[in-house]
Amino acid sequence: MAEEMKEHIYIIPLRDARRMPRWKRANGAIKDIRKYLAKHMKTEDVKLDKTINEKVWSRGAEKPPSKIRVRAMKMEDGQVQAELALES
């Protein structure tokens, strides 16, 4: 198993998902999270944990959260694994 190189906590804004049709907003929010992490962690290989998906879809497809707090870990092989960060 690859060892962790970098670990960051990001608060990702999901405002752009509100500009999509109502029934596509949660899908758009997931794509926005992937795009944000790919840009900031400088890689295209992004894996999202199930907890992120559950948080985005918790209020249905039409009402995703306006922002989400995510812990992203970049492995030695360049892959980014993201999970929902605990609120403190």
From Swiss-Prot:
Q: Name one GO molecular function term.
A: structural constituent of ribosome
Q: Which GO terms describe its cellular component?
A: cytosolic large ribosomal subunit
PROSITE patterns, A to Z: RIBOSOMAL_L31E
Q: Which UniProt keywords apply?
A: Ribonucleoprotein, Ribosomal protein
Under the heading Pfam families, the entry gives: Ribosomal_L31e
Q: Which GO terms describe its biological process?
A: cytoplasmic translation
The protein's matches in PANTHER family, at most eight in alphabetical order, are given as: 60S RIBOSOMAL PROTEIN L31
Q: Which family does it belong to?
A: Belongs to the eukaryotic ribosomal protein eL31 family.
What's the protein name?
Large ribosomal subunit protein eL31
